[in-house]
Amino acid sequence: MVIGLTGGIASGKSTVVDFLISEGYQVIDADKVVRQLQEPGGKLYKAIVETYGLDFIADNGQLNREKLGALVFSDSKEREKLSNLQDEIIRTELYDRRDDLLKKMTDKSVSKNFDSKSQGKNLSVNKPIFMDIPLLIEYNYTGFDEIWLVSLPEKIQLERLMARNKFTEEEAKKRISSQMPLSEKQKVADVILDNFGTIEALKKQIQRELARIEEQK
């Protein structure tokens, strides 16, 4: 079973992912995969240099993600350009990792440390795997048995983003408005995890859904 996990910026997906991993579930983290692909010599790194030149390469040779992010979030045309550039590379890599993990589980092998966030627990072949993809709905990723959405009111999302990233209100609103509204994503999701309360309340929702899946086996 493959579950797609998504949500808006500062919605709390990382909290969900950390909890799932602590419970022994395997999570393919799209943001982490992208960062790996953006390392010097990686497929995305090469594609960005070929498209933008060295303007977004820092003195240490690393990709200047902050500078690149500022460009794409302030210019919708550049955002679309970069998204199209990266989409095929990222999509292929994510599906390859999913297929690799499913094969290992089908072969009943025990996989450790597939993701660097893993706590090193032995993973049961009967457990679902999760794919944490921020733009899962926007880019029409498929192949999931269920889609889980981490959601919260926009006011709380705005406050959390400002606090987490030290953004001004204007900067935070611009980032949020660049994404599909959570209200629209809710129409597609099979499970909605409400993250406007405490972490413990969020964990209880996750445990309830995991128990439901276990009962369906």
From Swiss-Prot:
Primary subcellular site in the record, as a coarse category: cytoplasm
EC number(s) recorded for this UniProt protein: 2.7.1.24
Residue intervals of the DPCK domain: 2-217
Catalytic activity reported: 3'-dephospho-CoA + ATP = ADP + CoA + H(+)
GO molecular function: ATP binding; dephospho-CoA kinase activity
Organism superkingdom: Bacteria
Gene3D superfamilies with a match to the protein in the record: P-loop containing nucleotide triphosphate hydrolases
Residues annotated to bind ATP: A10, S11, G12, K13, S14, T15
GO terms for cellular component: cytoplasm
Signal sequence extent: none
Location within or outside the cell: Cytoplasm
Pathway: Cofactor biosynthesis; coenzyme A biosynthesis; CoA from (R)-pantothenate: step 5/5
Keywords noted in UniProt: ATP-binding, Coenzyme A biosynthesis, Cytoplasm, Kinase, Nucleotide-binding, Transferase
Pfam families on file: CoaE (PF01121)
InterPro entries: Depp_CoAkinase (IPR001977), P-loop_NTPase (IPR027417)
GO annotation (BP), single: coenzyme A biosynthetic process
PROSITE patterns (alphabetical): DPCK (PS51219)
Classification via PANTHER family: BIFUNCTIONAL COENZYME A SYNTHASE-RELATED, DEPHOSPHO-COA KINASE-RELATED
Family the entry assigns: Belongs to the CoaE family.
Function recorded in the entry: Catalyzes the phosphorylation of the 3'-hydroxyl group of dephosphocoenzyme A to form coenzyme A.
Protein name: Dephospho-CoA kinase
Organism: Lactococcus lactis subsp. lactis (strain IL1403) (Streptococcus lactis)
Record gene name: coaE
